[in-house]
Regions:
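Extended beta-solenoid/beta-helix repeat architectures
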Residues: 1-133
Length: 133
C-alpha cells in the first residue's frame, strides 16, 4: 500500500506500507508487515510485530509488540516496544522504552532509554539517561 495523503489506515497482516511526503494526520495500525516512511510525518504507528523504517521523517509515536524500528536522519521522540529491536542513525529518539530487546544508536541523540533486560549499544551518540532493570 502506498500512502500519499493524511488519513487512518488499517493494514492487513503482512502488507507493506510506504508513506511519501504526507502531512500530519497519518495513523497506521498493523499486525505484522512493514512500514517505510520518506520525508513524511507519520505521527501514530501501532504494530504487533513487523518492521518500521523512517528516513528524514517525523514519527513521534511508535508502539510495537516485538518487531524492528529503524530511523535514519529522523525524529522519533517516543518509541515503546515489548521485545524487538531499535536502531537509530543520525536521528533523534529522545524516549525509548523497552521490555527486553536491543537498542543500537550511531551518531544519534537518545537522551532517555528505559529497559527491563535487553541490550544497549551506542556509538558517537548522546544518551544521557540509560536505565536498565
Amino acid at each position: 500500500m502506498k500512502i500519499e495523503k493524511p488519513g487512518n489506515y488499517t493494514v492487513s497482516d503482512g502488507e507493506d506500507v510506504e508513506v511519501f511526503g504526507t502531512g500530519e494526520g497519518v495513523v497506521i495500525i498493523m499486525t505484522g508487515g512493514v512500514v517505510s516512511t520518506w520525508d513524511s510525518s507519520a505521527p501514530v504507528i501501532t504494530m504487533t510485530g513487523g518492521v518500521v523504517s523512517t528516513w528524514d521523517s517525523s514519527a513521534p509515536v511508535i508502539t510495537m509488540t516485538g518487531g524492528l524500528v529503524r530511523t535514519w536522519e529522523s525524529s522519533a521522540p517516543v518509541i515503546t516496544i515489548t521485545g524487538g529491536y531499535v536502531r537509530t542513525r543520525d536521528s533523534s529518539a529522545p524516549v525509548i522504552t523497552m521490555t527486553g530487546g536491543e537498542v543500537w544508536t550511531l551518531d544519534s541523540s537518545a537522551p532517555v532509554i528505559n529497559m527491563t533486560g535487553g541490550y544497549v549499544w551506542t556509538w558517537d551518540s548522546s544518551a544521557p539517561v540509560i536505565t536498565k532493570i
